[in-house]
Amino acid sequence: GKTRFAMRMGRVLSESIPTLYLNLEGYSGLNYYLPEESGMNLGDLLYYMKQESINPVWKISTLISHMNGVDYIAPIRAEQDFREVTKEEWNQLLDLILEKSIYKVIILDLGDTVDGLYDLLGRCSKVYTPYIEEGAAKAKLNQYEENLRSAGYGEILKKTVRRRMGKPRNPVALEASASKITEFPDGERKS
């Protein structure tokens, strides 16, 4: 559902603008969609960002993989390592990629265990929220939206697009949706 949608959006966007897919979930399951990676991953880039003797910008290109029209950096494999990344580090990572690499759009496939989730959502120009037509799923979506409001992040809902999952979507509709990801308020392209 959600990951497949994010990857398809990455494919569509990458046809017209340099786009990078990042999976920020504790348990990404990305090896279902992409080849198993035993090499370096997003955790290595975060490590390089902390080292004064290593320029992390040079490492970005060595960490990029490409599959089915999507550029991506393999996600952090160990969930405990993922949980140790702070919201400041996530923000520094996004800034580094957007300011120092070729990528103009980053597709974030977010899970609820990422530190600073609401801050990351706040940076996005569009937030796609998938859901299924099922009672418990709707209750979870309503609870998520209420949590955003009560935590002072209600503005995120104004740029949220709900996407019903379960039935294959029309590729033309997906392309039209993908084209709506445009500008970050300060003029930089972000997602």
Language-model segments: residues:
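Conserved catalytic-core segment of NTP-binding enzymes
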Residues: 92-184
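Cytosolic-facing regulatory segments adjacent to core modules
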Residues: 52-67, 72-110
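Walker A (P-loop) phosphate-binding motif
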Residues: 1-22
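Phosphate-binding loop that captures ATP/GTP phosphates
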Residues: 16-72
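Active-site donor-binding loop signature of nucleotide-sugar glycosyltransferases
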Residues: 24, 75, 186
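Charged, alpha-helix-enriched surfaces in structured cytosolic catalytic cores
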Residues: 4, 37-40, 88, 115, ...
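Flexible loop/turn segments at secondary-structure boundaries
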Residues: 29-30, 81, 115-117
